[in-house]
């Protein structure tokens, strides 16, 4: 089994918790949640800068696709990832 980067494991756990209470959301709300929870490295991204915004977007999408694959392996949830909406649903 693949071992995760320690940063990614923490992000996936926090995303799973967040989606448990907000099954339909968007990328901005996810990033703001990760920043509010001080999840590294999101706590250091400055969304007002192009580099910070890109880094937050890239890492958020990367983590969401890892979470989607995890949900598929566990046959637990489906995760729909669109440019303006993210939705978790029971299978």
Where do the protein language model's features map onto the residues?
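Short "pre-J" leader segments immediately N-terminal to J/J-like domains in DnaJ-family
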Residues: 2-91
């Amino acid at each position: 089994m693949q071992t995760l980067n320690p940063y990614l494991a923490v992000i996936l756990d926090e995303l799973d918790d967040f989606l448990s209470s907000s099954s339909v959301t968007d990328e901005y709300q996810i990033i703001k949640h990760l920043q509010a929870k001080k999840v590294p490295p999101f706590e250091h991204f400055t969304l007002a800068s192009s580099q910070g915004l890109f880094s937050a977007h890239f890492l958020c999408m990367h983590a969401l696709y890892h979470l989607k694959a995890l949900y598929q392996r566990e046959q637990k949830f489906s995760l729909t990832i669109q440019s303006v909406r993210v939705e978790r649903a029971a299978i």
